[in-house]
Regions:
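Conserved nucleotide-cofactor-binding alpha/beta core module
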Residues: 76-196
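Class I SAM-dependent transferase core
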Residues: 1-84, 92-95, 100, 113-124, ...
Length: 215
């Protein structure tokens, strides 16, 4: 039997998000409207709204809904920003950010996943203000910097200097930092030339990879 996806989304928002401290109404609305099931592979579609990350191929994952919501909420977007997303994956988080910001620049290292993200965004009607670029997210995307916010969906031992440099002032960046077994979701805030860093939560993400030319 085909699930009632609208009910699945409503339940996910109520229990996994609002029930765990996500209070930003715009973030909750975005995740209640975007059809997550249309962004995941067919073989895991039945689990689209599970409280867990799901494989999307090439050793990559789509984050659990709570983590997508938490990262978006911590960016405190007001709708005027250009957001840089590193690790576009299947395009789902970019779709969420696109409902919260003026423009999203989403970088994906794996060309086939960049193509998938573009197609998913096009097919679901969520790509009008999203530009997907196949390239090395560790380098950011200098051409459109500075960014009002940066979201990184892969972990590294430290935050790449290029991303901090491309973060606007004021600006906020969220990224998991650490190794395979111990990662922290860090929030970097830049204001009046000062940079502050805090820890939002512990987490577990795939590693941030680099070394591929942009296209």
């Amino acid at each position: 039997m085909i699930p009632n996806w609208a009910e699945e989304r409503h339940s996910m928002v109520a229990t996994q998000l609002a029930g765990r401290g996500i209070f930003d109404c715009r973030v909750l609305r975005a995740l209640s409207e975007i059809p997550r099931e249309q962004f995941v592979p067919l073989d895991v579609r039945i689990q689209a709204y599970a409280d867990a990350p799901l494989g999307i191929g090439f050793g990559q994952t789509i984050s659990q809904p709570y983590m997508t919501a938490l990262m978006a909420e911590r960016l405190c977007l007001d709708g005027s920003e250009t957001v840089l997303e590193v690790g576009a994956g299947c395009g789902y988080a970019a779709a969420v950010l696109a409902m919260l910001a003026a423009r999203v620049v989403a970088i994906e290292l794996i060309p086939a996943l960049a193509d998938l993200a573009r197609e998913n965004l096009r097919r679901t009607g969520r790509g009008e203000n999203v530009q997907v670029i196949a390239g090395d997210g560790c380098l950011g995307w200098e051409e459109l910097a500075p960014y009002g916010a940066i979201s990184v969906a892969a972990a590294a031992p430290e935050i790449p200097a290029a991303l901090v440099r491309q973060l606007g002032d004021p600006g906020r960046l969220v990224m998991p930092v650490g190794g395979d077994g111990d990662q922290e979701l860090r929030l970097v805030t830049k204001l009046d030339g000062h940079i502050d860093t805090s820890v939002a939560t512990h987490c577990r993400f795939v590693p941030l990879r680099g070394g591929q030319k942009r296209r």
